[in-house]
Amino acid sequence: MPIRIDKKLPAVEILRTENIFVMDDQRAAHQDIRPLKILILNLMPQKMVTETQLLRHLANTPLQLDIDFLYMESHRSKTTRSEHMETFYKTFPEVKDEYFDGMIITGAPVEHLPFEEVDYWEEFRQMLEWSKTHVYSTLHICWGAQAGLYLRYGVEKYQMDSKLSGIYPQDTLKEGHLLFRGFDDSYVSPHSRHTEISKEEVLNKTNLEILSEGPQVGVSILASRDLREIYSFGHLEYDRDTLAKEYFRDRDAGFDPHIPENYFKDDDVNQVPCLCWSSSAALFFSNWVNHAVYQETPFDWRKIEDDASAYGYL
């Protein structure tokens, strides 16, 4: 699909070399259609990398998407230049009067902290509450999924004995589900986290559907029946080398990390890591945009609040 983003965003040139269509405002205006408005709350430290990863996977249907990036005013990024944030990102006050068809909340490297000790927690809480009436479908990823479940349902996260890092199999549990249209019975995806949730808590505290799970990863993807809330604990958006970079970063910092499982051939870190989830990632993000966002969101954004009330979100 054509994605509308600032043509000066560094991701643009990378995407164009991959033959991904990026549209400027002038050309978009000539199409005379309402684009889907997507808001990305990017909490990852390497923001430009995450921008490219997500935009690559969002560019997979013929729909036109208008992308905005959001950052936390209450947190200062140590790994991304302030000029980049000021140029390409908006703050919550700048978007709070707008409505969005979809929103992505990324992971964040703060899972070692209790939720309330994260420096931007109060701002995050306000954004999630706002999203109930201003966003139709929200896709939460990794820590973003754990935080969303905690705020909405009181589902806790629990420290694992060791970091879960690697490429793991998961089974799809709801045959024909719209988010998994085109999937086989099982698929693989990257996971990279120190914490997990309890399946029992999900079943007892929420009315969400568990859509996929695996023996090593546990619950992987769950969603509300109306697809307004989607929680994914893996990282389908990751590049081939993302887990490798995380491993070498931690090793060089002296943390003695485990080699990511099912990733390097023969666990030899000098080998090129496998890329065996890209087709699943393309399907998943395309299904989210088409079936959870495009097919369901009201043409008049103001009706999102009416839908939120009708479905018990308020």
Swiss-Prot record:
Reaction(s) this enzyme catalyzes, per UniProt: L-homoserine + acetyl-CoA = O-acetyl-L-homoserine + CoA
Annotated compartments: Cytoplasm
Broad EC category: transferase
InterPro entries cross-referenced by the UniProt entry: Class_I_gatase-like (IPR029062), HST_MetA (IPR005697), MetA_family (IPR033752)
Keywords per UniProt: Acyltransferase, Amino-acid biosynthesis, Cytoplasm, Methionine biosynthesis, Transferase
Main location: cytoplasm
Membrane-spanning intervals of the chain: none
Positions with a binding annotation for substrate: K163, S192, R249
Pathway entry: Amino-acid biosynthesis; L-methionine biosynthesis via de novo pathway; O-acetyl-L-homoserine from L-homoserine: step 1/1
EC number: 2.3.1.31
Gene3D superfamilies from the UniProt entry: 3.40.50.880
GO BP terms: L-methionine biosynthetic process from homoserine via O-succinyl-L-homoserine and cystathionine
Marked site: Important for acyl-CoA specificity: E111
Keyword Transport: no
Site (Important for substrate specificity): S192
A GO molecular-function annotation: homoserine O-succinyltransferase activity
GO-annotated cellular components: cytoplasm
Active-site residues, record numbering mapped to chain: C142, H235, E237
Family: Belongs to the MetA family.
PANTHER family, A to Z: HOMOSERINE O-SUCCINYLTRANSFERASE
Purpose of the protein: Transfers an acetyl group from acetyl-CoA to L-homoserine, forming acetyl-L-homoserine.
Protein's UniProt name: Homoserine O-acetyltransferase
Organism: Streptococcus pneumoniae serotype 2 (strain D39 / NCTC 7466)
Gene it is expressed from: metAA
